């Protein structure tokens, strides 16, 4: 089954407009843009004619249209879903994500796309934690996070960094833009 939708020009914007083919209509927010760049994939679901759609995500291209269109959307970790056949924009960031209106459908699509993964497949040796950002979370969230790391990442160096300023995060995000 193949489907084609419209994305913004060169899949490079986060608002989803396409001046050449028309901006996909966001029926969940009349008069508002659908978000981009996978705008057509998200807007198609606002018609209630489809159960789910797929989009590519490099720097927000599934998550942003999901938010703008009132959908459930996800960008899984890089290389978690095969990108064969996906036109690359930034191969070291590109991944495939999906949208749905229903949590049940969203989960079913996820079960198909994200086949079961054994924890032994995890092959990284280092995990970096931004302490000052973690401190912004509620105490219960911090405790759950630390317990998860302790119980699920044994034998992995856990470097704890502090003073990760918002400016550093913003500067690194600019690279994606």
Map each language-model feature to its residues.
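A short core secondary-structure module
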Residues: 78-130, 135-137
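Short charge-dense sequence patches
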Residues: 23, 53-63, 92-103, 135-137, ...
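Amidase signature
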Residues: 115-177
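A sequence-composition feature that detects small, non-aromatic residues
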Residues: 29, 42-44, 66, 90, ...
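Predominant activation on well-ordered alpha-helical scaffold segments within soluble catalytic domains
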Residues: 42-46, 75, 104-111, 146
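Short glycine/serine-rich loop/turn segments
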Residues: 1-93
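Catalytic-loop motifs flanking and including active-site residues across diverse enzymes
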Residues: 37-41, 105, 141
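Hydrophobic transmembrane alpha-helix bundles
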Residues: 38-50, 91-101, 154-169
